[in-house]
Amino acid sequence: MSQLGSRGRLWLQSPTGGPPPIFLPSDGQALVLGRGPLTQVTDRKCSRNQVELIADPESRTVAVKQLGVNPSTVGVHELKPGLSGSLSLGDVLYLVNGLYPLTLRWEELSTSGSQPDAPPDTPGDPEEGEDTEPQKKRVRKSSLGWESLKKLLVFTASGVKPQGKVAAFDLDGTLITTRSGKVFPTSPSDWRILYPEIPKKLQELAAEGYKLVIFTNQMGIGRGKLPAEVFKGKVEAVLEKLGVPFQVLVATHAGLNRKPVSGMWDHLQEQANEGIPISVEDSVFVGDAAGRLANWAPGRKKKDFSCADRLFALNVGLPFATPEEFFLKWPAARFELPAFDPRTISSAGPLYLPESSSLLSPNPEVVVAVGFPGAGKSTFIQEHLVSAGYVHVNRDTLGSWQRCVSSCQAALRQGKRVVIDNTNPDVPSRARYIQCAKDAGVPCRCFNFCATIEQARHNNRFREMTDPSHAPVSDMVMFSYRKQFEPPTLAEGFLEILEIPFRLQEHLDPALQRLYRQFSEG
């Protein structure tokens, strides 16, 4: 067994459902990883000796040297045979061709100094103790006052108790509004209780055994526009005015915690209710971002600015009401959900259309991909074409369309099949590759990825939440593509056009599938 460092050891973490942790030698010995049982990688593009790793526990870094032919990636840097890179804690090593991620982690020694704590999802040795019964999940007691967690603030007032049912509320526009009458508060004290009926209703809920919770998005804190301490003071003043104990969860950044994504609810259920299960059916969420249409009630001419609160309730499965419906007993107003519903997406359905065509050609050809950033092009191409021997040409990797053309021409001269993995929105961007095919005397086909802009934006948000190494794609880029887009036609010179519907990957981890099917933008 390798000697442990003075404080712990470095290890590599696979995605959920992947192989077990890979511990790195702490004595300077090299560890070679590649295709094999340790990584559970069977892709023949990955060499059995793909990378050499040398861990340095003192600096908590790992030197990575590529041994295999196909590229490994360290963080955002793609390696070549014989070249090296360095991993720091939290960095991701992609074993080959941007696939099979392994994240560098550090494991502290236990306080006893005899055995380090097991990493997440790693079972302990049953022989280490006499009692081999499964250990009970640790119950975390809620701390009174404020806690600053990663991209999340949590406040627990005195008197808050764990309960099996929750009455949860948005803050601005639901429990309070501006005293000035303006849309946004002009100062920390520019607020008042939205309706006089609210305090009494909250007292009734508390008496009925509900835990009272506030879920609020406050992106201004993460952007540095709203000082956290100022907002904390405002929350405490509001709670004092309401007169009942609340637990408050504040999302300060985009991502998993920001409504409508369910991260704040997940934290409440898993970390902030002292192990008491919460009945979703017996709970409720109240919010004003409900997707209501213009003129949704007499005197209410403006449509809702967002649907995030209603979508948050949908994601969690909570009964939902607006403040007017809940506190004033107004009838339900008409509303509209987003055009794209991620709950409808699955791994079923045709891989491509028409199904009578062949996805792959046995002979040299050029395949030109067309589709929004986030339409699923690269994943599909890597999984189905590159794995079958097609040469992958990508502008993000090569840097310019001129280099893409040169790479395409070089591959065709070698009798290779080529796939152009760019967005290619218009006729001129596609024509250069059609010309490459004509010059080489080979056919050119188009793979048109059918994801709409709404779905592509959803896909990009999903990638940002699940892959820290993925560069965000701005809305400006997305709308620019939509403006440039010209549907591909056979008249351009394509032999065939295949339509590629977006499908979830069949091997996607169930937890990631659940996350993908959540609404992620209001």
UniProtKB/Swiss-Prot annotation:
The FHA domain binds threonine-phosphorylated peptides from XRCC1/4, and is responsible for the recruitment of PNKP to the sites of DNA repair. The affinity is ten times greater if peptides are also phosphorylated on the serine preceeding the phosphothreonine. Its main location: nucleus. The modification N-acetylmethionine is found at M1. The modification Phosphothreonine is found at T122. Pfam families: AAA_33, FHA_2, PNK3P. This is Bifunctional polynucleotide phosphatase/kinase. Residues 6-110 form the FHA domain. ATP binds at G371, F372, P373, G374, A375, G376, K377, S378. It comes from Mus musculus (Mouse). One of its GO terms (molecular function) is polynucleotide 3'-phosphatase activity. In the N-terminal section; belongs to the DNA 3' phosphatase family. GO terms for biological process: DNA damage response; double-strand break repair via nonhomologous end joining; protein K63-linked ubiquitination. The modification Phosphoserine is found at S114. The keyword Nucleus applies. Plays a key role in the repair of DNA damage, functioning as part of both the non-homologous end-joining (NHEJ) and base excision repair (BER) pathways. Through its two catalytic activities, PNK ensures that DNA termini are compatible with extension and ligation by either removing 3'-phosphates from, or by phosphorylating 5'-hydroxyl groups on, the ribose sugar of the DNA backbone. SUPFAM superfamilies: HAD-like, P-loop containing nucleoside triphosphate hydrolases, SMAD/FHA domain. Keywords: Acetylation, ATP-binding, DNA damage, DNA repair, Hydrolase, Kinase, Multifunctional enzyme, Nucleotide-binding, Nucleus, Phosphoprotein, Transferase. It comes from the Eukaryota. It is found in: Nucleus. It catalyses: a 3'end (2'-deoxyribonucleotide 3'-phosphate)-DNA + H2O = a 3'-end 2'-deoxyribonucleotide-DNA + phosphate; a 5'-end dephospho-2'-deoxyribonucleoside-DNA + ATP = a 5'-end 5'-phospho-2'-deoxyribonucleoside-DNA + ADP + H(+).
